[in-house]
Amino acid sequence: MSWLPVESDPGIFTEIIQQMQVKGVQVEELYSLDFNSLDEIRPVYGLILLYKWRPEEKENRVVITEPNPNFFFASQIINNACATQAILSVLMNSSSIDIGSELSELKQFAKEFPPELKGLAINNNEAIRAAHNTFARPDPSSIMEDEELAAAKNLDEDDDVYHYISYLPVDGILYELDGLKEGPISLGQCLGEPEGIEWLRMVQPVVQEQIDRYSQNEIRFSLLAVVKNRKEMYVAELKEYQRKRERVLQQLGALQADKYAEKSSYEALDRELSEVNIGIETVSQKIVMEEEKSKNWKKENMRRKHNYVPFLFNFLKILADKKKLKPLIAKHHP
């Protein structure tokens, strides 16, 4: 079974990750690279830049052809799999992510492989391919005649080709991972923890330079972030606020029983309780927003999984049989 093209969408990629049994991770689309935007979505495991591919000039930067054996770099073997492979590059190289049994076994199996064989190992992994193909665009070839299929293939040849590059810190080094290159590219030593802000400060100008270059050439692009599951984070934060609230209430109760307690102590605890209540309200709203977003993603993903092509094909065929199709086309395209 081949790898089929999928739409670039954070909801799709999040569900693909979940189907690969990876826990506690989701994908978000970034609309700004300013530090406040990056800081708000931490921890960020990796950034993925999507752009319309064009032949580039010769690479002058040093490509690491023999990376650390624990570093997972795979050559891009199948074009339609490049989005999933870019996500895998982040997942496989992030020690703080629970990648599940399927990816763990693949990582161990391909550990000593060169990049080309790692790419083939991904290509031949049925579980990953099945998760990817769940969101494949409907294939009209199953209902088309030979002439129609040939025409469709000719149209497909003119389709835009999109490419993905991953950026992430590994063992104190910031890397750029491009499956079309021979190996990873080191962008320099990166201080701080992988889940901190330091590597994001370092990668920001690198990605911004790429985006500016694409913008000048009118090349379409988008930026994705592989991040910790937001709802799980907020639920943990809410529980911490609730525990803090209980402690403050207990302290207030103890003060009420102490007739020698100072007024300033009451006031300090009241302020703290007020801050905690505001925190609880804020985090609760964030949880609701994440639940709503997840619900919308699931709704959209169900719509994407449905194949509307047979219905549309038969509908147009009925119109043609009744001699109504050509008049409609002529009316809207005189």
Curated annotation (Swiss-Prot):
GO cellular component, one term: cytoplasm
Segments crossing the lipid bilayer: none
Phenotype seen when the gene is deleted: No visible phenotype. Uch1 and uch2 double mutants are less fertile, accumulated less chlorophyll and have slightly fewer and shorter cauline branches.
UniProt-listed Enzyme Commission number(s): 3.4.19.12
GO term, biological process aspect, one: shoot system morphogenesis
Positions of the record's site feature: Transition state stabilizer: 76
Tissue spec. comment: Expressed in leaves, stems, sepals, stamens, petals, roots, hypocotyls and cotyledons.
Domain UCH catalytic positions: 2-228
UniProt subcellular location: Nucleus; Cytoplasm
Enzyme class: hydrolase
Single annotated GO MF: cysteine-type deubiquitinase activity
Keyword Endoplasmic reticulum: no
Keywords of the record: Cytoplasm, Hydrolase, Nucleus, Protease, Thiol protease, Ubl conjugation pathway
Catalytic reaction annotation: Thiol-dependent hydrolysis of ester, thioester, amide, peptide and isopeptide bonds formed by the C-terminal Gly of ubiquitin (a 76-residue protein attached to proteins as an intracellular targeting signal)
Annotated positions for site Important for enzyme activity: 178
Active site: 82, 163
Keyword Magnesium: no
Domain ULD: 307-334
Family in the record: Belongs to the peptidase C12 family.
Purpose of the protein: Ubiquitin-protein hydrolase involved in the release of ubiquitin attached via both peptide and isopeptide linkages. Able to cleave 'Lys-48'-linked polyubiquitin chains. Involved in the direct or indirect regulation of AUX/IAA proteins stability. Acts as a linker between the TREX-2 complex and 26S proteasome.
PANTHER family: UBIQUITIN CARBOXYL-TERMINAL HYDROLASE (PTHR10589), UBIQUITIN CARBOXYL-TERMINAL HYDROLASE ISOZYME L5 (PTHR10589:SF16)
Further information: UCH1 and UCH2 are not integral polypeptides of the 26S proteasome, unlike their S.pombe and animal orthologs. However, they interact with the 26S proteasome lid complex as well as to the TREX-2 complex.
Subunit structure: Heterodimer. Interacts with EER5. Interacts with UCH2, DSS1(V), DSS1(I), RPN3A, RPN3B, RPN12A, RPN12B, SAC3B, CML20 and NUP1.
Protein's name according to its UniProt entry: Ubiquitin carboxyl-terminal hydrolase
Designated gene of the protein: UCH1
